Amino acid sequence: EKGFGFISTENGQDVFAHFSAIQTNGFKTLEEGQKVEFDVEEGQR
């Protein structure tokens, strides 16, 4: 809905995620509880 949210790492840290970073075909969306693989990168704030 908002185009951004947070992903929780295995150790419980929350990481900001913007929809533009989602690499998939079709509609870029994630569901609560969905398992994903990701790399943490520093970006502009």
From Swiss-Prot:
InterPro entries: Cold_shock_CspA (IPR012156), CSD (IPR011129), CSD_CS (IPR019844), CSP_DNA-bd (IPR002059), NA-bd_OB-fold (IPR012340). GO terms for cellular component: cytoplasm. Induction: In response to low temperature. Keywords: Activator, Cytoplasm, DNA-binding, Stress response, Transcription, Transcription regulation. Pfam families: CSD. It is found in: Cytoplasm. It comes from the Bacteria. Disulfide bonds: none annotated. Residues 1-45 form the CSD domain. GO terms for molecular function: DNA binding. The keyword Nucleus does not apply. Homodimer. This is Major cold shock protein. It comes from Streptococcus dysgalactiae.
